[in-house]
Design a protein with these regions (language model features):
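Iron-sulfur cluster-binding electron-transfer modules in prokaryotic oxidoreductases
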Residues: 1-288
């Protein structure tokens, strides 16, 4: 499941990564093929509450189990998820590799358009904010000929989708065991900028009855691959130490939710705590 070579100092030196940084594992691609087969577009075609779950490159490589959990959560709320796996091009775009990011965006849009056509323009949900919101914010400039289609779709993080839909659902919280303890929440920068910092908190409050303490900070300091680089390590840590790390150190509760994969990586590297995705927290409290 995880390539042991990734742990070596030589690998980090070759990639320009600081030696104190951990590297994420790489999942077997067979996981995604199984999800796309098990939650196919065709199987959701006759469902009036079909949704397209767009699985990005970060989730595919680093956290594949999140896909199955998301499908369980969506299913418990009455949706029929169709899994579409395609890299968003976010990493290439952040690195300045525009031709490569454009190719990946074109490929992703083609798969999403095909799914949306079959599913009558069903909502498109993403698990990683930086990836799914690339389509919302940047695909229109990369692919101006697709701008009208993009703007006509409902494309959002799963956090925002649920926050918007929960008022329409009857007794949605019945699908979950209550968790009335405090949850510490850190929201990804893309979400704060393009959606709402309150969406994730609202979902946790409505579905679990949780008390949510949102970390009022700016960037966690990872900023995609920025914090991984050898020359940026000290600055990345200083950014985390401004607000985020002290807040985590003083938090006495059990559950920390961080909505970005880079945010969770930063917390794991610089604290003794593990942060989880919103979907992880909801799944752990499902009434199976």
């Amino acid at each position: 499941f995880i390539n042991p070579v990734r742990k070596s100092g030589l690998t980090k030196r070759m990639m320009g990564i600081h030696p104190e940084r951990s590297l994420p594992g790489l999942a077997n691609p067979a996981y995604m093929k199984a999800y796309e087969k098990g939650y196919s577009v065709e199987s959701a075609a006759d469902h009036e509450r079909a949704v397209i779950l767009w699985v990005d490159e970060f989730t595919q490589a680093n956290d594949p189990m999140l896909v199955g959990k998301a499908c369980d959560v969506l299913g418990a709320l009455g949706y029929s998820p169709a899994v579409v796996c395609s890299p968003s091009g976010r990493a290439a775009l952040s690195g300045g590799f525009l031709p490569e990011s454009k190719k990946l965006a074109q490929k992703a849009l083609k798969k999403l358009q095909n799914a949306a056509k079959t599913l009558k323009n069903a909502p498109i949900l993403g698990l990683e904010a930086s990836a799914v919101l690339s389509a919302v914010d940047e695909y229109g400039r990369l692919l101006p000929e697709e701008k009208a289609w993009i703007e006509a779709q409902r494309i959002a993080t799963i956090d925002k989708f649920l926050a918007d839909d929960l008022p329409k659902l009857d007794r949605a919280s019945d699908a979950f065991e209550a968790y009335e303890e405090e949850i510490l929440l850190h929201v990804h920068c893309h979400q704060k900028s393009l959606e709402s910092a309150g969406d994730t908190a609202y979902v946790l409050q409505v579905l679990l009855g949780a008390k949510v303490d949102r970390v009022k900070s700016s960037c966690c300091g990872m900023a995609g691959s920025y914090g991984m680089k050898r020359e940026n390590y000290d600055m990345s840590r200083k950014m985390a130490e401004l607000v985020l790390l002290p807040k985590i150190e003083s938090f006495e509760g059990e559950v920390i939710v961080a909505t970005g994969t880079s945010c969770r990586h930063q917390i794991a590297d610089f604290s003794q705590r593990k942060a989880e995705h919103l979907v992880d927290t909801l799944w752990e409290h499902l009434r199976f």
